[in-house]
Amino acid sequence: MSDWLGGMRIAPVVIVPLACKGAYLDRYAEPDKGWTDRDEGRWPAPYWHIDTGMATLLILQTAVDEGLGACFFGIPPERIGGFREAFGVPSDHTPIGAITIGHRAQDPGTPGSAARRARRTADEVVHRGRWGGKG
């Protein structure tokens, strides 16, 4: 087992962010939001997942700001049933991944493909004014 995985297995904190589509649709059907139905068609993307992802990012950022180590990782689909059963998670709540938080280990460098692959340039990922527009 690699050092990083061993460290994640003993992290003192594991957070599993859960998205709940029903809670999201219910909230936006309340009078102060202006809609009275739960029509999913109003959403161009599943914002219940997007908002959960943004909350996850804030958890990661806060952990790092506090000098801790943190890592987001996906939960393999074949393990979600066991996770639900172990923690009594209702079927309408969807885990979007997991976060481990602990004291950061010494970083020996990344041996994986990310270390060998060059980062894309800003011109490759940022478009100004229109797709392909340079800045």
Spans of model-derived segments:
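Glycine/small-residue-rich phosphate/adenosyl-binding loop
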Residues: 1-52
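Short secondary-structure boundary segments
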Residues: 19, 75, 103
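Alpha-helical transmembrane segments of helical membrane proteins, especially in multi-pass transport
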Residues: 54-56
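Short, hinge-like loop/turn segments at secondary-structure boundaries
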Residues: 33-34, 88-91
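Hydrophobic pocket-lining residues that define ligand/cofactor binding sites across diverse proteins
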Residues: 60-63
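C-terminal helix-cap and adjacent tail motif
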Residues: 96-135
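GST superfamily/GST-like fold recognition
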Residues: 46-47, 66-82
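Glycine-rich, charged/polar anion/phosphate-binding loops
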Residues: 1-2, 83-86, 113
